[in-house]
Amino acid sequence: MKKMLFTSESVTEGHPDKICDQISDTILDAILEKEPEENKMNARCAVETLVTRGLVVVTGEVRTSAYIDVPTLVRNTILDIGYNRAKFGFDGETCAVITSIEEQSPDIALGVDRSFEVKSKEKEDPFEKIGAGDQGIMFGYATNETDAYMPLPILLAHRLAKRLADVRKSNTLDFLRPDGKTQVTVEYDENNNPVGVETVLISAQHSPDISRQELEEAIKEHVITPVIPENLVTKDTKILVNPTGRFVIGGPQADTGLTGRKIIVDTYGGWAPHGGGAFSGKDPTKVDRSATYMARYVAKNLVASGAADEVLIQLSYAIGVAQPVSINIDTKGTAKVDEEKIYKVVKEIFDFRPAAIISNLNLLQPIYQKTAAYGHFGRKDVEFPWERLDKVKELKAALGL
């Protein structure tokens, strides 16, 4: 039997890059929360964060009528993650916070506020008004491999990372500190079905007074065993806990973090392609974010409808243009109906213009900080509108399923 291994990784909320993602999305949420309802569609946010030893730098472009206390938001986010003592190497109370935030470029605003379609045809359709915030390609994916419609390796890696944070915050394992990483290797058979977990790797920041043996035993009992399904653990499954032997110095004390450096962790763990655009700190007129959510929404509903076992969707946009430049649907040979029919039905049922995506998925809510750690897709601990399965019935009827 041919053996195929696939590996995905995740990181905890205390990882330096994820600290930055959470800060950027916390600022976006504050804008969406404080902006008057009638003006939310005009609010803009593109915020980048850097964290390093004792320092946070927040920069970017924003358009809002609301007052946003950025330093306080930064400090509270860091404290909530768990960096609240100097001995952890980083402290939200005492770190320096530098901000350099400007207004959105008027050249960009020209095309986003009033799309190419409106300028050229004077269309009255409100969904034509907003153009894409940039050019680019975006991918969405779903598979019936798991009940979350996600590939198993990234799903398990996220759940291990979340579990690491949960047992730390509940003081179940009070020697843990905020930084951490997980990685899961899954074995697949010749039909691409998962048959076992080949390797579990966990690197967890810890206090200096815990022995390696105690740490390993505690991680196995309280993190790995509750997450990895028993039927996927074999006699050959390898468990690696802190293979360097020590992980006391972590977080921004050990590594500089930046917004948008964990884009594969954020999506499908490398199983599906990525267009390259990060999510955090971007308002939903940025199609890097909203169109990726839309592509996932469509792919998930298609798989749930029984149209295919897996679906990969690619979208592309031009800056300032409302309509997508291209839509590609790939079922990897698993379609139960004609792919041309699937494409036609998708274009009839779903609207891929940015304003329509924002409206239909209700993307002007302050929900983004929750996306900034443990993945944007396939979550059970939170509900996101792009994870809804509210088009399954309509798709089944249209596709004759």
UniProtKB/Swiss-Prot annotation:
The keyword Iron-sulfur does not apply. GO terms for cellular component: cytoplasm. Binds 2 divalent ions per subunit. Binds 1 potassium ion per subunit. Signal peptide: none annotated. ATP binds at residues 15, 179-181, 246-247, 255, 261-262, 278, 282. It comes from the Bacteria. CDD domains: S-AdoMet_synt. It is an enzyme of class 2 (transferase). Keywords: ATP-binding, Cytoplasm, Magnesium, Metal-binding, Nucleotide-binding, One-carbon metabolism, Potassium, Transferase. Mg(2+) binds at residue 17. It catalyses: L-methionine + ATP + H2O = S-adenosyl-L-methionine + phosphate + diphosphate. It is found in: Cytoplasm. GO terms for biological process: one-carbon metabolic process; S-adenosylmethionine biosynthetic process. The keyword Nuclease does not apply. K(+) binds at residue 48. Catalyzes the formation of S-adenosylmethionine (AdoMet) from methionine and ATP. The overall synthetic reaction is composed of two sequential steps, AdoMet formation and the subsequent tripolyphosphate hydrolysis which occurs prior to release of AdoMet from the enzyme. Homotetramer; dimer of dimers. This is S-adenosylmethionine synthase. The gene is metK.
